[in-house]
């Protein structure tokens, strides 16, 4: 479905992403992890058209999309969420989602957008009440709204950016289960950027790890968690995989 080859992004003399290549298969959930500043968001911004790569290729469903404008990428079947939700507070919950649906698939049909909004809100567990205010949503509700907006665009590939940020343990588990439900029931392929590795590892099919803009590991969650390079990046050279798991458990618990 998605083939990324030799992706590079430079900002002046700083290289944020350096020669990263990977593939994502139809129906897969790929976890993308790494320390702050490792290049995760930069890759998402290039996949979604917000940034133009310095070099490299991004091929989605057989079409080269590197440098394509964001609105065309959305119409082409890639939707994304953002780490920090920024809804339109003058619009209702329903209107926020319908607006995304209106522009997402390029049909500019109000009826189609409203139908997409109803389905997306139902999927994430938010009411389709057309008068409910965005201001009544807490952290978990805003994350659901962000996800519903992305789903309303009708994506074949969903880029989920830190869907667990700011949530408690129960809400984190629910959000992770929601991503798996979206894949299982809607057939949407997902790339998931997340810092809460303990939760991510139980949901994804594969994991890719970045450090300083370079891919340092890729594979099954169990293999990546025991990779010495990954352990060193997260905890230092004297750590082992059990310490990595314990550290991530504490992070997920907010300790």
Say what each PLM segment does.
Residues 1-255:
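Glycine-rich phosphate-binding loops of nucleotide-dependent enzymes
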């Amino acid at each position: 479905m998605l083939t990324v080859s030799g992706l590079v992004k430079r900002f002046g003399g700083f290289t944020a992403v350096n020669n990263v290549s990977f593939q994502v298969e139809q129906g897969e959930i790929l976890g993308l992890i790494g320390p702050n500043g490792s290049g995760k968001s930069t890759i998402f911004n290039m996949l979604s058209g917000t940034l133009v790569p310095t070099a490299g290729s991004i091929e989605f469903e057989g079409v080269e999309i590197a440098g394509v404008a964001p609105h065309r990428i959305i119409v082409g079947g890639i939707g994304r969420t953002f780490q920090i939700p920024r809804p339109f507070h003058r619009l209702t919950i329903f209107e926020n989602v319908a607006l995304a649906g209106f522009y997402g698939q390029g049909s500019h049909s109000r009826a189609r957008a409203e139908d997409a909004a109803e389905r997306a809100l139902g999927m994430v567990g938010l009411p389709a009440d057309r008068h409910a205010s965005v201001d009544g949503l807490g952290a978990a509700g805003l994350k659901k709204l962000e996800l519903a907006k992305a789903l309303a665009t009708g994506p074949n590939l969903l880029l989920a950016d830190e869907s667990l940020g700011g949530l408690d343990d129960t809400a984190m588990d629910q959000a992770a289960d929601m991503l798996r439900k979206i894949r299982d029931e809607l057939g949407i392929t997902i790339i998931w950027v997340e810092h809460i590795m303990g939760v991510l590892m139980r949901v994804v099919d594969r994991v890719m790890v970045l450090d300083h803009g370079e891919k340092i590991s890729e594979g099954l969650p169990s293999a990546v968690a025991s990779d010495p390079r990954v352990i060193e990046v997260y905890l230092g050279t004297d750590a082992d995989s059990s310490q990595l798991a314990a550290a991530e458990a504490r992070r997920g618990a907010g300790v």
